[in-house]
């Protein structure tokens, strides 16, 4: 997502050269940094009071307004500058998941930003996603109220719901249906002639029958993810000019700890009785939603027409608190101007 710059046009460049006239100023700056450092206070507010600051979220706009208030209190000239808009907004709440079985466990997962939450607490059985038309017809009746385990490994992005993704699905379905016919022939030959032909592998595409599974009543989709789990956002949807509040995703897109995914996948294959339960509070906001840069400046006394630009991006992915990316930039940047 577009990086948002916190641009601070500062006064004349501060140096630490050992010039006698500058000794007092340098000493004062060092003393403030050692004895009155406010960086952790800035980080505490940004990461714990506001948390993840996704573009299009209330948390981002609240954080931007707070930065304006802080800069004004330090005597800076500051303003909010409109940077752009997103078609819809997104606010993330808490999320929970459980495996309900004799070996039940709390599930470790995340969902990409700008994807759907659940409709309250939702519980259901699990099925493997179909790879061809025959498999889809076989499980169609079990999709209603089911959590679907999909193929592939999570890299942060959600299921591709775009028109280009649908075009890829059409081609892969055709190829897999041909592979299915060849495999059926191989099975027949193995049975009739005692041959030991191996089955041909099917091509994978996460959510290959996505629309069909949604229409059949699936509760949501679960994909295996390496740990730490990476969750980004629905970039294709946000860049689509046709995106609006009436054509948003309706089912959760869960990225589950690969070790737990493997356990659940094996339980499905073994046809063991169990259920999965999720409560995911992802909420959309009517758009378009504007987002802003925070621009603050201190006019230099000696070189008023020269600038030192100090910046960091205030936005952050919202599955965490944005302490590293980019709290470690915003905290020092903001405090630099207090010392100036």
Kindly give the residue locations of the regions a language model identified.
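Bacterial Sec-dependent N-terminal signal peptides
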Residues: 1-22
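Stable alpha-helical elements in mature extracytoplasmic
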Residues: 25, 39-42, 59-67, 135, ...
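Soluble metallo-hydrolase cores and metallopeptidase-like ectodomains found primarily
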Residues: 23-25, 108, 114-138, 239-322, ...
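Conserved small/polar residues in nucleotide/adenosyl-binding loops
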Residues: 336-340
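Second-shell loop/turn segments in exported
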Residues: 27-33, 50-58, 126-129, 194-203, ...
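Noncatalytic luminal/extracellular "stalk/propeptide" segments of secretory-pathway proteins
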Residues: 44, 48, 52-186
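Loop-rich non-cytosolic ectodomains and luminal regions
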Residues: 185, 193, 201, 206, ...
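N-terminal hydrophobic or amphipathic helices/low-complexity stretches enriched
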Residues: 19-77, 233, 298-302
């Amino acid at each position: 997502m577009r990086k948002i710059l916190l641009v601070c046009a500062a006064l004349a460049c501060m140096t630490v050269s050992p010039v006698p006239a500058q000794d007092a100023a340098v000493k004062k700056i060092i003393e403030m940094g050692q004895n009155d450092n406010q960086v952790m206070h800035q980080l505490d507010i940004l990461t714990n009071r506001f948390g993840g600051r996704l573009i299009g979220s209330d948390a981002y706009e609240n954080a931007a307004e707070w930065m304006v208030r802080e800069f004004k209190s330090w005597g800076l000239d500051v303003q909010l500058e409109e940077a752009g808009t997103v078609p819809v907004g997104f606010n993330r709440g808490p999320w929970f998941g459980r495996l309900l079985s004799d070996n039940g466990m709390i599930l470790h997962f995340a969902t990409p930003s700008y994807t759907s939450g659940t409709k309250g607490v939702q519980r259901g059985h699990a099925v493997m996603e179909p790879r061809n038309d025959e498999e889809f017809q076989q499980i169609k009746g079990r999709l209603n109220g089911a959590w679907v385990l999909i193929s592939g490994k999570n890299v942060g992005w959600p299921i591709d719901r775009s028109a280009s993704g649908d075009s890829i699905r059409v081609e892969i379905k055709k190829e897999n249906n041909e592979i299915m016919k060849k495999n059926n022939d191989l099975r027949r030959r193995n049975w009739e002639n005692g041959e030991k032909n191996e089955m041909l592998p099917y091509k994978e595409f996460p959510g290959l029958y996505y629309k069909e599974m949604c229409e059949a009543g699936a509760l949501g989709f679960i994909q295996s993810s390496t740990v730490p789990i990476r969750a980004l956002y629905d970039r294709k949807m946000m860049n689509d000019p046709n995106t609006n509040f009436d054509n948003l995703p309706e089912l959760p897109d869960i990225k589950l700890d690969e070790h737990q995914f493997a356990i659940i996948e094996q339980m499905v294959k073994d046809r063991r009785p169990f259920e999965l339960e999720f409560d995911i509070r992802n909420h959309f906001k009517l758009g378009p939603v504007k987002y802003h840069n925070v621009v603050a400046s201190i006019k230099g006394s000696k070189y008023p027409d020269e600038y030192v630009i100090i910046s960091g991006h205030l936005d952050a992915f919202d599955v965490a608190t944005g302490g590293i990316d980019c709290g470690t930039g915003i905290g020092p940047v903001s405090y630099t101007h207090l010392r100036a």
